[in-house]
Amino acid sequence: MTIISVEGKSLGAELAVWGVPHNYVLAFAEKSTSKNGRISLHPFFFNDTEHMTNPRHWLAINAAFWCCVYREAESKEAQIEALAGIRAIFYTAGALGVGEIKALIQEWWRTTYELHLIPAPNHSAVTTQPAFH
């Protein structure tokens, strides 16, 4: 298994597009692993700050990260994994009432449809369904 990572400069640009404040970007960078210009999530990432608790910003950070993972994916499996991450954030944003992030992901999904051909987040990207006996 490989550790999921993205190109740091691309992630920085994506975080700006998602409107993540600089102090949140710095906190995320401090809690992530950086090596050879690539950023990977810490295996047990946890926001232990007392003052940086805005769910909108943390959801935006994670959406930006997984959109970069999708963009850099080199296999169908990696694309499916990234889409699953984006889907999870989409439904988490909805459950937390963070409509802005839900709407931004919905727009991203619509814009990238020609690449992934999945009509909506509630549709599976898996092409071979498991058979249960």
Where are these regions (language model features)?
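Short intrinsically disordered terminal tails
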Residues: 1-4, 52, 115-133
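Short terminal alpha-helical segments
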Residues: 8-30, 41, 59-67
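Short amphipathic alpha-helical heptad-repeat segments
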Residues: 55-64, 79-82
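Charged, low-complexity interaction regions
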Residues: 69-80, 94-98
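Short, charged, amphipathic alpha-helical segments
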Residues: 80-87, 102-106
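Amphipathic alpha-helical coiled-coil segments
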Residues: 88-101, 116
